[in-house]
């Protein structure tokens, strides 16, 4: 599943993003944030974190530095 999501993000960065320009108000960009979130947290939680980030990325947002939260250790 991660491979499919990474392929979709790569397609977006290569084909769609150049047409839209640099509009993200955050660092790292939303697509980079999504890639890191999926890489560190897995497909389900990473997609959830990326969707939350996309909801915060709008013209009325102050933006700024918003790093992917570190993975929490699993309870045993």
From Swiss-Prot:
Keyword Cell membrane (UniProt): yes
Transmembrane regions listed in the UniProt entry: none
A single GO cellular-component term on record: plasma membrane
InterPro entries in the cross-refs: Membr_insert_effic_factor_YidD (IPR002696)
Source organism (scientific name): Paraburkholderia phymatum (strain DSM 17167 / CIP 108236 / LMG 21445 / STM815)
Entry's family note: Belongs to the UPF0161 family.
Official protein name in the record: Putative membrane protein insertion efficiency factor
Pfam families in the record: YidD (PF01809)
Covalent S-S links between cysteines: none
Keywords of this entry: Cell inner membrane, Cell membrane, Membrane
Lineage summary: Bacteria, Pseudomonadati, Pseudomonadota, Betaproteobacteria, Burkholderiales
Functional description taken from the UniProt entry: Could be involved in insertion of integral membrane proteins into the membrane.
Annotated membrane topology: Peripheral membrane protein
Top-level lineage group: Bacteria
